[in-house]
């Protein structure tokens, strides 16, 4: 079974249609990204259960505005502040912080998916000796790449590009093996690139 076969299987649920009044054939972009993150979360659980590392999904702090006390449910809330990156943790004594991005485009990841407050945070992680990278899922190609933040940010700043090309990511990133367990084995790439 190849990487493409495995990712196609994982992304199969991403092709479900979201019905709305304007376009009943539109694909839910939020669900597509959440499925990718769910696969990362499952991989992280496996890593933790096997005592390989401790990497967790970071939650974005919210301020509760209204709550239904009978059902013990939040009915209205706002984000307190911007989030930093999606995941953080420790592997072999080194701090890790990374962001996960998914695109349905075959040739690029739009730059508007990379937020400046996250870039600032990830640069600080690097400045203090941590490991910072992006996991980029080209779901149409059934390929996931790990790309180091320093390499990515230098490219963005030097080219003034509006998107990050697939060719750049393929050339400068590292293909992540897809398996049954762990689903997205990015830890193997981290061992090769950073240790």
What is each residue range found by the language model?
Residues 2-23, 170-195:
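Charged phosphate-binding loop/patch that engages nucleotide di/tri-phosphates or the phosphate backbone
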Residues 147-169:
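Short, electropositive alpha-helical surface patch
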Residues 64-66, 105-108, 142:
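Short, solvent-exposed loop/turn segments at secondary-structure junctions
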Residues 17-78:
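Acidic-basic catalytic patches of nuclease active cores, encompassing PD-(D/E)XK
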